Every structure is written in structure tokens, then in C-alpha cells.
């Protein structure tokens, strides 16, 4: 390896310092060696390239150089960066040998760092640049060299009409959303105000209810104490009904206990007393009634014995029925009940007419039947004559045409018939009264009645 010495007056700072990373060995060594650099004279040592490095293509070398220029462009002004780009273009026209010479002039100087650290740093930088493709370096160079045209800028600034419509629609929707949000805020504020008012009214109501006087509370408590409970009223009514009505055939065994009468009397006496004593008596009576209830299971067993009978009766009911039937049998026997009616008439008992009187009675009976028949025939003849007379009169009126001249003639006829009937009834009543007064014999009555029947009666 050849070493060439030279001065570093034209170089402001070493190239390796720009690539140093914070925390690395190079940066730490730089911070420790600063006073030494100020005291010693700067020198540059140029080393011959290694055999593998000289065979690299020219494009990769140009890419490495452009990458270095990009890193340094951030620390330079635009004018300095433009001058550097012009120098790079002029330098790209030279061959690879000129590039190697220029590389030696920049790197080969007396550096205060050890040779091992410099070699490690160079290897790391070469590996990083080798990983990057050459196309990226060429695109970067073209972007730096070729400025944008005015037409491209105008195309970028142009806005699609669809985008404009979408933007307008978004703005309209934003306005609607803002209005909805404002309305929602107003509704929430109103709801909060209403809740506050309701809470205030509730507090006022509670204060007013708690501010009632002691006298009002006492009156209400007394009124509620006077009102009886429904269950107690029903119990009292049921007890009274049971005491008033006693069934002939009770379906359950009677409670033969004088305690119930005592309870009923105490109930009537305590109705005028205090309400508290009344309630206590009702409760005790109700509890006693529950204890004295009849066992309905035993009652059902007794009823099941006579399940085939037409009427189900208890043992007590059967005994009572037998007693009643015995009393009836003692009063009258079955023979008297089922005997012939003709046996009731016994000769020598009651009224027994003599044979002459018996013949007279038979004659009277026959004459009465004859009178009845004559009466019926007379009534029928009279009715027929009246009907014929009425028909004859109606026919005459129709012929003469005087029906309209006498409208009340029918009423007069009816009244006359009623008068005649009343006269007959009076005569019959008068005859009966005379019979009762004078005790007229049946024969004279029959003769008189027959005489009156034989006489003509005109309506």
C-alpha cells in the first residue's frame, strides 16, 4: 500500500466527521481528541484502493458520490448545492481513474483516529451503499437535475368537478350536523330546566305535607280507627244470621255450646263501646269459631253410606223423620186412609128422612130439573127473538135509509136490556129473602117459581 502525504489547508473538516453517528466509537474519540487536533498540524494520507474496490462499476461509484452530495446538501445553502451539482456533472465525464485520484485526495490525510476505526467505518459505509439499488440513485439524480414543468404544476392544481361536488355536499352535511347539534343542546338545556323546576316543586310539596298541624294528624288517626274492617263486619253479620235462622234439617252437626250465645250478647253490648274492644272481641270469636268447626270429612263418610238412596240424610235427620212419621201413624191408621168412601155413611147416623119426605124430595128434584130446562129454553128463545128483532130493525133502517138519522138507537136498546136483567135479578133476590123470612116449604117455592115461569116475560 502506497502512502502519499499532503496538506489539508483547503479542506474545512474531515469527511468522516459528517458520517459519524452519535454513541459510536468514532464520535467518542472525536470528543476526546479535539484538543489534540488543535495543537497538531493536519495532514492527509492517501491509500491505494483494494483490489475488489477498483473493479466496481462506474455507475455504483457515481451513485455513492451522489448520495454523499445529498447528505451534505442538507447542511449547505441552495447556491452552494447548485455549484456542487455542476461539479458532479463535470466529474461524471471523467473516467474511473480520475474518480479514484479525487477520492484519494479527499480521504488521504493525517487523521488523529486509529487506522482500525477508519477501516471499520469505511466498510460500514460501503455495505450500506451496496444494499441500495442503482435505479434509486439514478431517479434521485434525475429529480435533482430535471425541474418540474409549468404544465405539470397546472395539472396538479386542477380540481376534478366530481371532487368539487363532493366537497359542496360535505359542506352542506356539515351545516346540517351543526344545526342538529345546536338543537340537541337546546333540548338538553330545556330538559335540565324542567327537571330543576320539578325538583323544586317536589321539595315544596314535601315541606307543605310535613307542615301539617298536630291536630289534623290526630283527627285523621281517629277517623281511621272508627272505620271497621271488612272482614270483621262480614264475621259479625254471619254470626247474627246463624243465630236468627235455625234450619229444620241442618246439614252439619249443631254446635251445642252456650259460649256462642254469650259471644253474641257481648257483641251486641260492645257495639256501643269503644272500637278497640269491639275488634278484640271479634278476633276472639273468630278464633273460637274456627276451633269449633265440624269435621267435614266425617260428615262425608256418613253421607257416603246412603249413596244409593234418592235423598241423602244424616243420622240425626233420619231419627227426626222417623219421629214425625210415628206421630202421624198414631193419629190415623192406614186402613182409615185407604178405606172406601161409602163406609163413611153409617145407617142411623146423621139426617135420615122418612119415606114420605123422601118421595117429596124426589119430586122437588124432578121439578127443579124441569124448571132449569124451561129456563134454558126460554133464554134461548128470548135471545133468538132479540136477535131476529135486531136484524129486522137493521134491515128496515137500511131500506128506509134512516141509519144516519138515529145514531143513538143502539145505545138505547143496550141500556134497556141491562135494565130488564137487573129487574129479574132483583125479583129473584126478593124471593130468596122471603123464603128465609117465612121459611117457605120447598113445594110452595116450586109452585110459585113454576107459576112465574109459565107467565110470559116480554123484553
From Swiss-Prot:
Residues 1-54, 252-289 are annotated as: Disordered. Keywords: Coiled coil. Residues 13-29 have a biased composition (Low complexity). Residues 162-202 form a coiled coil. Residues 276-289 have a biased composition (Basic and acidic residues). The keyword tRNA-binding does not apply. Belongs to the FSIP1 family. This is Fibrous sheath-interacting protein 1. It comes from Xenopus laevis (African clawed frog). The lineage of its organism: Eukaryota, Metazoa, Chordata, Craniata, Vertebrata. The gene is fsip1.
Amino acid at each position: 500500500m502506497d502512502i502519499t502525504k499532503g496538506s489539508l489547508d483547503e479542506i474545512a473538516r474531515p469527511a468522516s466527521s459528517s458520517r459519524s453517528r452519535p454513541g459510536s466509537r468514532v464520535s467518542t474519540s472525536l470528543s476526546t481528541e479535539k484538543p489534540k487536533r488543535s495543537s497538531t498540524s493536519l495532514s492527509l494520507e492517501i491509500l491505494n484502493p483494494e483490489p475488489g474496490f477498483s473493479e466496481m462499476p462506474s455507475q455504483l461509484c457515481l451513485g455513492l458520490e451522489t448520495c454523499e452530495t445529498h447528505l451534505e446538501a442538507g447542511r449547505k445553502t441552495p447556491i452552494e448545492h447548485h455549484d456542487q451539482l455542476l461539479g458532479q456533472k463535470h466529474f461524471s465525464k471523467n473516467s474511473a481513474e480520475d474518480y479514484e485520484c479525487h477520492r484519494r485526495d479527499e480521504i488521504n490525510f493525517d487523521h488523529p483516529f486509529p487506522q482500525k476505526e477508519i477501516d471499520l467505518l469505511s466498510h460500514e459505509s460501503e455495505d450500506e451503499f451496496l444494499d441500495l439499488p442503482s435505479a434509486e440513485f439514478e431517479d434521485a439524480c434525475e429529480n435533482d437535475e430535471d425541474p418540474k414543468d409549468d404544465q405539470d404544476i397546472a395539472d396538479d392544481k386542477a380540481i376534478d368537478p366530481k371532487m368539487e361536488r363532493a366537497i359542496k355536499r360535505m359542506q352542506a352535511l356539515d351545516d346540517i350536523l351543526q344545526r342538529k347539534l345546536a338543537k340537541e343542546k337546546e333540548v338538553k338545556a330545556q330538559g335540565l330546566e324542567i327537571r330543576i323546576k320539578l325538583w323544586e316543586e317536589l321539595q315544596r310539596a314535601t315541606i307543605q305535607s310535613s307542615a301539617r298541624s298536630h291536630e289534623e294528624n290526630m283527627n285523621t288517626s281517629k277517623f281511621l280507627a272508627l272505620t271497621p274492617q271488612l272482614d270483621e263486619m262480614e264475621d259479625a253479620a254471619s254470626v247474627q244470621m246463624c243465630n236468627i235462622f235455625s234450619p229444620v234439617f241442618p246439614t252439619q252437626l249443631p254446635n251445642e255450646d252456650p259460649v256462642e250465645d254469650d259471644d253474641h250478647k257481648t257483641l251486641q253490648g260492645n257495639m256501643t263501646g269503644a272500637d278497640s274492644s269491639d275488634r278484640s272481641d271479634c278476633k276472639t270469636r273468630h278464633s273460637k269459631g274456627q276451633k269449633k268447626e265440624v269435621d267435614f270429612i266425617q260428615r262425608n263418610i256418613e253421607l257416603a253410606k246412603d249413596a244409593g238412596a234418592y235423598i241423602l240424610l244424616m243420622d240425626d235427620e233420619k231419627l227426626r223423620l222417623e219421629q214425625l212419621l210415628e206421630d202421624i201413624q198414631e193419629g190415623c191408621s192406614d186402613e182409615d186412609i185407604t178405606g172406601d168412601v161409602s163406609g163413611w155413611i153409617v145407617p142411623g147416623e146423621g139426617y135420615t128422612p122418612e119415606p114420605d119426605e123422601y118421595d117429596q124430595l124426589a119430586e122437588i128434584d124432578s121439578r127443579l130439573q124441569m124448571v132449569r130446562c124451561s129456563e134454558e129454553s126460554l133464554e134461548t128463545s128470548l135471545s133468538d127473538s132479540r136477535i131476529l128483532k135486531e136484524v129486522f130493525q137493521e134491515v128496515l133502517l137500511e131500506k128506509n135509509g134512516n141509519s144516519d138519522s138515529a145514531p143513538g138507537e143502539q145505545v138505547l136498546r143496550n141500556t134497556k136490556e141491562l135494565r130488564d136483567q137487573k129487574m129479574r135479578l132483583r125479583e129473584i133476590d126478593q124471593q130468596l129473602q122471603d123464603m128465609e123470612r117465612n121459611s117457605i116449604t120447598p113445594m110452595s117455592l116450586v109452585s110459585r117459581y113454576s107459576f112465574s115461569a109459565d107467565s110470559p116475560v116480554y123484553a
